[in-house]
């Protein structure tokens, strides 16, 4: 994984989802107080392309980057990778944003329906632009799809098209629940399937839960998210999360 680091202070590792590393623009102000460590997952530019991208292999690669005491934040597919890596990592905190670990809530009707809509995309012979439009519409992302796709975006979409389906991931609940660091699970109040996954993660990991509406699946861009994240990080650093769960800030589920 190619890694960019900016800022100073405790390390906050930010792992992007499908679609590539956009550089986390809304979180850049945190570089005044944290060292932002932003890996680009293998297979995504500027890394060389791969024929197949696997979350288990990427969890191993992420583990090589992590250092004791890191804060780890994973969005979407990067959230699945982060959950796998965190099970054996010495972290200060873990936050995941709508990880598509749909296997943990496969009994939920909305999850089963969403997986049935996504399954035809892996594999597919759709051209990259049509693939991206269909994916964005299906998962509820607020991403604007340009036409034609710029070369760097097309390269990221081609990487996305060879990712292993994230609902195949086996989340190590026991190890994560036993880990001493606090956990935060965030959803975007836009799709019952992601709500269901996040609800299971909250319960099984004894995690703090937050809902940040306003940007669909593109939670890093949601109004108020960066402030909510920093509040969690601040309490994690001070050790104030031993008993606090702050679930009262969660509005009703969308389904």
Question: Where would I find each of the regions flagged by the language model?
Answer:
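Conserved alpha/beta-hydrolase catalytic His-Asp/Glu region
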Residues: 125-161
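Short beta-strand immediately N-terminal to the catalytic nucleophile in serine-hydrolase-like folds
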Residues: 72-74, 97
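Gly/Ala-rich beta-loop-alpha elbow adjacent to hydrolase catalytic centers
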Residues: 74-78, 82
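Flexible "cap/lid" loop of the alpha/beta hydrolase fold
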Residues: 87-122
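Catalytic active-site module of serine/aspartate enzymes centered on a nucleophile-bearing elbow/loop
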Residues: 205-255
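Conserved serine/cysteine hydrolase catalytic core
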Residues: 148-220
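Conserved HGGG/HGGXW glycine-rich cap/lid loop of the alpha/beta-hydrolase fold
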Residues: 1-48
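Active-site loop/oxyanion-hole signature of alpha/beta-hydrolase fold enzymes
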Residues: 35-71
